[in-house]
UniProtKB/Swiss-Prot annotation:
Entry protein name: Large ribosomal subunit protein uL10
Any GO BP annotation: translation
A Gene Ontology cellular-component term: ribosome
Keyword Transmembrane helix: no
UniProt organism field: Leptospira biflexa serovar Patoc (strain Patoc 1 / ATCC 23582 / Paris)
Gene3D superfamilies in UniProt: 3.30.70.1730, 6.10.250.290
Annotated Pfam families: Ribosomal_L10
Family label: Belongs to the universal ribosomal protein uL10 family.
UniProt entry tagged with the keyword Lyase: no
Function in brief: Forms part of the ribosomal stalk, playing a central role in the interaction of the ribosome with GTP-bound translation factors.
Keywords linked to the UniProt accession: Ribonucleoprotein, Ribosomal protein, RNA-binding, rRNA-binding
Gene symbol of the encoding locus: rplJ
Subunit structure comment from the entry: Part of the ribosomal stalk of the 50S ribosomal subunit. The N-terminus interacts with L11 and the large rRNA to form the base of the stalk. The C-terminus forms an elongated spine to which L12 dimers bind in a sequential fashion forming a multimeric L10(L12)X complex.
Length: 177
């Protein structure tokens, strides 16, 4: 008979994977409790959560998760040593940036791999998406791009109106003298 606490842990991990299917796995050996708390706080700001995992239980939850069971996910030798899973709903680039920036200051945090939209990213993939703009930044860029022509037209019309006003003023002054 399986240990009830392990069954519960697998169920909890499956629930997390189904709610937040994108994730990063990172080694945290050597981080202090304060460091872990700081990292968790930064990750919460991005709408993600970090959980220290038991590797075998995470693998089992991954295989049983409805989001992931149709994918043959192979992370190779990633499952060695203590790992933390950082779960994200859809903002994995922002989460990856938080992890990458944190790892610059705290070398004990080592990004191992990630999983986003059905693809295993690997360490280099996670670091690459960390350089991408966030969803909010992309939306702002699109809005600026859409708004730019209208702004240019309005500016052009204002310049024409100002030139016309100056010309009328000049004619009025000339006729008035």
């Amino acid at each position: 008979m399986a240990n009830p606490s392990k069954i519960e842990a697998v169920t909890e991990l499956k629930t997390r994977l189904e709610k937040r299917p994108n994730f990063i796995l990172a080694s945290y050996s050597g981080l202090t409790v304060e460091d872990m708390s700081n990292l968790r706080a930064k990750l919460r700001k991005e709408g993600s959560e970090m959980k220290v995992i038991k590797n075998n239980l995470f693998l089992r939850a991954l295989k049983e998760s409805s989001e992931h069971k149709n994918n043959s996910i192979d992370f190779g030798d990633v499952y060695k040593g203590p790992l933390a899973a950082i779960f994200s709903l859809d903002a994995l680039p922002a989460v990856a940036k938080v992890c990458k920036d944190f790892a610059k200051d705290k070398k004990e945090l080592e990004i191992k791999t990630g999983y986003m939209d059905g693809e295993v990213l690997g360490k280099s993939g996670v670091e690459a998406i960390a350089g991408l703009p966030s969803k909010q930044e992309l939306l702002a860029q699109v809005a600026r791009g859409i708004n730019a022509p209208a702004t240019q037209i309005a500016s052009g019309i204002n310049q024409i109106m100002a030139s016309l006003a100056r010309a009328i003023n000049a004619v009025a002054e000339k006729n008035g003298n």
